[in-house]
């Protein structure tokens, strides 16, 4: 009887630990200077072009010109 209770208790403890690890791993965030995305957020700062930074720099590039 004691063996059965111990086995069940151990089994329930393993299930609880696996659930805890799942929550921790799915809600983790990434520090500055690492890769980020919509589903992998930054801990602090913003996700700019796939990288965690404090602020997003303005994007410079070619602008379309209207031709008449």
Curated annotation (Swiss-Prot):
Look up keyword Nucleus and say if it applies.
no
Q: Where is the signal peptide?
A: 1-26
In the UniProt record, does the keyword rRNA-binding occur? no
Propeptide residue range(s): 64-68
Provide the alphabetized UniProt keywords.
Amidation, Cleavage on pair of basic residues, Disulfide bond, Secreted, Signal, Toxin
Q: Name one GO cellular component term.
A: extracellular region
Name any one GO molecular function: toxin activity
Q: Which cysteines are joined by disulfide bonds?
A: 29-43, 36-48, 42-52, 47-56
In which compartments does the protein localize? Secreted
For this UniProt entry, what is the primary localization, expressed as one broad class? secreted
The record's comment about this protein's domains reads: The cysteine framework is XI (C-C-CC-CC-C-C).
Q: What protein is this chain from?
A: Conotoxin Em11.5
């Amino acid at each position: 009887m004691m063996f059965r209770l111990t086995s069940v208790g151990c089994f329930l403890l393993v299930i609880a630990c696996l659930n805890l690890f799942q929550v921790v791993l799915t809600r983790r965030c990434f520090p500055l200077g690492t890769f980020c995305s919509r589903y992998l957020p930054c801990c602090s700062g913003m996700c700019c072009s796939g990288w965690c930074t404090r602020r997003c720099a303005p994007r410079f590039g070619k602008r379309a010109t209207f031709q008449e």
